[in-house]
Amino acid sequence: MADTKYTMIGMTSAGKTCYITAMYMKMSAGFDGFTLVTDDRTRTKLERDILTLREPKGQDRFPTATDETTTRSYEFRLSYETKKIITFEMLDYAGGLLRSRENTYEQVKESIAESTALYIFVDGKSFCTDDREQREENVCYDPAMRLTPILQ
């Protein structure tokens, strides 16, 4: 069991799975003496996603998003020069779960309450306009409308 838990929420395609993949890609090789390790099953999945993420262009370069009705759990151990610092679990709630409103909100609220940190992801496409008012509307519409009820 992990020492601590982090919860990630955001709409579909906001980049939660890409974030986990990129974090693991950077930290599994080591960075300033720090390394990140995980179990074999998770490592195999993340290594496959890393190869996908390293594709040069196009939509195919992104890892497959978490299934619309799934919550994916990743458990990691952070070490410094082979000495364990902390183990942590990262919960990746599929963006589609936030649209369903069935039992999801209570599950996500419970996860947030048990977490040390909450990561909120907003799709970069929401910022891809020169019109400031449009950007604000894009960010407020889907993410805020879906996330605000769970955060209250």
Question: At which residue positions do the language-model features occur?
Answer:
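Conserved GTPase G-domain substructure that encodes guanine base recognition and part of the catalytic core
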Residues: D3-M8, S13, I20-V37, S115, ...
